[in-house]
Amino acid sequence: LVGSEMCIRDSTTGVYSILDVEPEFVARQMDCVFQDIFPDAIKIGMVSRPDIILAIAKKLTEYQAQPVVLDPVMVSTSGSRLLKEEAVDTLCSRLLPLAALATPNIPEAEILSGHPIENREQMETAAREISGRFGTAVLVKGGHHTSDADDVLCMDGKIRWFYGRRIDSSNTHGTGCTLSSAIACGLAKGLSM
């Protein structure tokens, strides 16, 4: 599913400004896509306002769209808060329950679980809590750890680790968005999680 909920002024070094589009535009945009070629998977990235989140959730429900991969973009790589405070509750109550998979990074998983994450055990605990609370598979991305880039998946109460080597680069903006998009593409092709 292709759609734009906002215009973002950013580069490989960070996000500089955000301009939201109106929820009515988002809803009409989703109608255009769903009524033309029904998508085999949906990936949702950054949405910053409750009214836009509600519009997206309404259309996903109306069209019974699945699978949904939700990258709950709340905190940038540089640590800036991207999701408005009042939108977190709406994201949790309306979008997360519709997702087949949520892919928070560590700071986002801390917000969703309400607990600090400083080690692998806490990553697992957060993944289990988020998965259980919202009824979705959860992949906590560990790239924000300084020593490794290991990710943990909680699906149906089971834990699976994916081990990765940290790449020393200053140009890593958007890696989580790329991962969630790749997962959505795999699901669209019929691959299982």
Question: What spans do the regions from the language model cover?
Answer:
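N-terminal beta-loop-helix "entrance" segment that forms/cooperates
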Residues: 9-24, 80
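Short, small-residue alpha-helix embedded
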Residues: 110-111, 169-192
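Conserved phosphate/ATP/ADP-binding segment of small-molecule kinases
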Residues: 85-159
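A short, N-terminal amphipathic alpha-helix
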Residues: 28-38, 128-133
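Glycine/charged-rich beta-loop-alpha catalytic/anionic-binding loops adjacent to active sites
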Residues: 156-168
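Short, small-residue-biased leader/transition segments that mark boundaries at the very start
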Residues: 1-2, 6-7
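Glycine/small-residue-rich loop that forms an oxyanion/phosphate-binding "nest" at active or ligand-binding sites
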Residues: 33-97, 101
